[in-house]
Amino acid sequence: MASTVANILKTISDKKALALFETIALTKPNTDILIAKTQLTRKQYYSRMSGLMRSGLVKRKNGRYTLTAFGKVIDDIQRTIKKVINEYYWKLKAIDSFEVADGGLSKEEHNKVLDTLIDNEKIKKVILANIS
C-alpha cells in the first residue's frame, strides 16, 4: 500500500488502531502485552497491526513492535493534533465567533484577542498568516 495522506489517516482514524499505535509508541511491547493492553481480539489485533505495518508506521524487531522513523514523525503530529483539540478547540471557536460578530474585529482587536486566548506561538502564526 502506498503511504498517501489518505491511507495514513485511514489507518490511524480507527480508535483501536490508534490505541495500538500509541501503545507501541510508549512501550515497544510484544504481541501478548499489546493484545492485553488494548483489549482487542486476536483477529482485531492482527488486522490493525497489518494496517499499521503496511502503512509504514510500525515494524517488528526482535519479537517486539516499534515505530518506524516515519511512525515516530506521525506519532508526534498526532500528539500535536490531540493537544490542539484538547487545549485550543474552544478558544479557536471563540476567535471565529468574534470574527463573525458585528462584521468582525479590527486587526488590532483580533491580535489582542489572539494574544489573550492563545499562548502557543505556532498556532498564533498559523492564524495570523490566514487573516485576510
Set out the residue ranges of the language-model regions:
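Short alpha-helical segments that sit at the start of domains
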Residues: M1-A19, S106, V113-L114
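Short capping segments at the starts of secondary-structure elements
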Residues: K15, L26-N30
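Pre-recognition alpha-helix immediately N-terminal to the DNA-recognition helix
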Residues: L18-E22, V73
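A short acidic, leucine-rich amphipathic alpha-helix
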Residues: T31-K37
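Basic amphipathic alpha-helical segments that dock to polyanions
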Residues: L34, Y45-S55
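A short, conserved structural fragment
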Residues: M53-R64
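Conserved segment of winged-helix/HTH DNA-binding domains
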Residues: A69-E99
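Exposed, interaction-prone assembly regions rather than primary DNA-binding/catalytic cores
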Residues: K91-S132
